[in-house]
């Protein structure tokens, strides 16, 4: 289920925002009435979309938007009066916060939510790819350490050590990293 956080001091605004994001699959959004409460909720749970309806009772909300972008993967939307939105838009857009001037139409709001959700999905893909590449780097380092071990302790050339690891991996149906780990563990 999609998770959204609505940060707003007004109940009428909460109902309006919740009704419109429900159309996009965010049927049970979490609510926070202040910046402090929102930060606690963001620390406790991951959200796809965070909507900040300014001003908040304890702060305006633009700092919260910047914090949310830096500390979470959520797409962040800041709702502000048009005059204020124009003033803070450039600074917040540099951080990746979507700024929507009030009043806005339901279609504009839904489009902003869809863009924020797209940002979240894109970041999730980038994080997954990053984790995959990090794992690959760990495996390569492990294989290189095993090769160095074979070269130093068994007098093999680099090509022979590489071939031994590759052949053992194919014969045992293990990854090269697992074979390298076995070689290093066996000789410790």
Annotate each predicted stretch with a short phrase.
Residues 1-12, 17-21, 50:
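Conserved acidic segment of CheY-like receiver
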Residues 131-188:
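C-terminal output/effector regions of signal-responsive regulators
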Residues 26-34:
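Short hydrophobic/Thr-rich beta-strand motif most characteristic of the beta2 strand and flanking loop
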